[in-house]
Design a protein with these regions (language model features):
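Conserved HGGG/HGGXW glycine-rich cap/lid loop of the alpha/beta-hydrolase fold
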Residues: 9-68
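Conserved alpha/beta-hydrolase "nucleophile elbow" surrounding the catalytic nucleophile
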Residues: 30, 97, 101-103
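Active-site loop/oxyanion-hole signature of alpha/beta-hydrolase fold enzymes
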Residues: 41, 48-51, 58-98
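Flexible "cap/lid" loop of the alpha/beta hydrolase fold
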Residues: 107-151
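Hydrophobic, aromatic-rich cap/lid helix
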Residues: 165-190
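Short beta-strand/loop motif that positions the catalytic acidic residue
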Residues: 197, 203-205
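Conserved alpha/beta-hydrolase "acid-adjacent" motif
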Residues: 210-215
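Catalytic active-site module of serine/aspartate enzymes centered on a nucleophile-bearing elbow/loop
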Residues: 230-265
């Protein structure tokens, strides 16, 4: 798939048209240590969108996949990644689309919506919730960077950091680029700013997603926010799950109503 130079850096992307006329376009933004293939293609999202007549655009965010691999934290941050996403839409001649981010990609997606609200038809945020607004624990940024740069993964102290490191190793990612990405300085997203976004917003997370928190807490910030909690899912198992796909497509179809009941299996 092609690479294009955007904002002076090389960005890899896929642009997949449906078999017939496109009914709509979606921009996909993957999570930390993932990439467009692992986050969206392998998990079945490409064919799922294609079957529904949706043009699918997905990029490897800076430091990930086949895109630029800077080892300087100054080259990362939410604002840079959002600018890359908007520049890709410009390059492809897309004026307006749906935007779907997962985990780290939700932060990029929200920044895209804040920077260019007129270009986002629907905003979908997965693997995120009320913990977005929690202060970062002291040393957490350094801990993630250290986990990515550690010579011996056995020295990593927490299970969450071990999971991200294992995931990065499985994808063959550049760990020094990921360390720089995790150390980037991005100001917190503010409730008041997010509350100005008037497009429909979906916030969805697994019931066992300890990284996200309650999706309802975040959804309440948006004037047209809706939340869904996925039973039986954690942060990593939610993205390929059929329940997440059903939720996203019901949302796009305007049919999303109630959350899954607590006893859903």
């Amino acid at each position: 798939m092609p690479n294009v130079t955007l904002n002076g850096v090389s960005i890899a992307f896929d642009d997949i048209p449906p078999a017939g006329p496109a009914q709509r376009t979606v921009l996909l933004l993957h999570g930390f240590a993932s990439n467009r293939n692992e986050g969206w293609k392998r998990t079945g999202w490409y064919p799922a969108f294609e079957r529904r007549g949706i043009r699918t655009i997905a990029l490897d965010q800076r430091g990930h996949g086949e895109s630029v691999k800077s080892h300087d934290p100054a080259d990362y941050g939410r604002e840079h990644m959002a600018a890359d996403a908007l520049a890709l839409l410009d390059h492809l001649g897309v004026q307006r689309c749906d935007v779907f981010g997962y985990s780290m990609g939700t932060r990029t997606a929200m920044q895209v919506a804040l920077d260019a609200p007129d270009r986002v038809s629907n905003l979908m945020l997965g693997g995120i919730g009320g913990k977005l607004f929690d202060p970062r624990p002291a040393g957490s940024v350094e801990a993630m960077a250290d986990a990515m740069s550690a010579e011996d993964p056995a020295t990593i102290k927490t299970e969450m950091l071990k999971s991200f490191r294992q995931f990065a190793d499985e994808q063959g990612e550049d760990r020094m680029a990921l360390a720089a990405c995790s150390a980037a300085d991005s100001p917190p997203l503010e409730r008041d700013a997010l509350g100005t976004l008037t497009m429909p917003v979906l916030v969805v997370a697994g019931r066992h997603d300890d990284l996200a928190g309650d999706p309802e807490e975040l959804a309440r910030v948006f004037p047209r926010g809706k939340s869904v909690t996925l039973p039986g899912c954690d942060h990593f198992s939610a993205i390929p799950h059929g329940l997440l796909k059903a939720t996203v497509f019901d949302f796009l179809d305007g049919m999303l109503d109630d959350d899954f009941p607590d006893n859903y299996r």
